[in-house]
Amino acid sequence: MSIADNKKAFHDYFIEERFEAGLVLEGWEVKAIRAGRVQLKEAYVVVKNGAVYLIGCHISPLPTASTHIHPDPTRSRKLLLHAAEINKLIGKTERAGFTLVPLDMHYSKGRIKLEIGLAKGKKQHDKRAAEKDREWQREKQRLVRSAQH
């Protein structure tokens, strides 16, 4: 079940490969995510010192979060991946010109997971072509439906 989607990622990038990563979260963050108070729109993923981090993800704390700790809604959160996956990501992002983008946050066996995509940026003409293709697919569906009735 999806918690939050990053629809902008599919508009701005060609997604080549997907990885599922665990997140290192604090208690108030888990409660806020379960309440649906998370936004992936401005978020991105970086590799620093052999570890993968989610940066710019906004998790709004619940009003009941804490009285003595001031939660930081946009702190960097560590992602949990296998060493082989991290090495693969490092190789692709450094050599092949790929970037890492968060695609969606979901539950897997009761745990909160983040799906990240190995992506290549789209140029403006690619975005236009994709939009034209989507419109044509919609028009085709409309024609097929009208022909069946």
Curated annotation (Swiss-Prot):
Biased composition (Basic and acidic residues): 127-142
GO aspect biological process, one term: trans-translation
A Pfam family annotated for this UniProt entry: SmpB
Keywords attached to this entry: Cytoplasm, RNA-binding
Region entry Disordered, spans: 121-149
A GO molecular-function descriptor: RNA binding
GO CC terms in record: cytosol
Entry keyword annotation includes Cytoplasm: yes
Subcellular location: Cytoplasm
Keyword RNA-binding: yes
Alphabetized InterPro entries for the sequence: SmpB (IPR023620), SsrA-bd_prot (IPR000037), SsrA-bd_prot_CS (IPR020081)
Coiled coil: none
Function: Required for rescue of stalled ribosomes mediated by trans-translation. Binds to transfer-messenger RNA (tmRNA), required for stable association of tmRNA with ribosomes. tmRNA and SmpB together mimic tRNA shape, replacing the anticodon stem-loop with SmpB. tmRNA is encoded by the ssrA gene; the 2 termini fold to resemble tRNA(Ala) and it encodes a 'tag peptide', a short internal open reading frame. During trans-translation Ala-aminoacylated tmRNA acts like a tRNA, entering the A-site of stalled ribosomes, displacing the stalled mRNA.
Family from the record: Belongs to the SmpB family.
Protein name: SsrA-binding protein
Species, as recorded: Thiobacillus denitrificans (strain ATCC 25259 / T1)
Lineage, highest ranks first: Bacteria, Pseudomonadati, Pseudomonadota, Betaproteobacteria, Nitrosomonadales
Gene designation: smpB
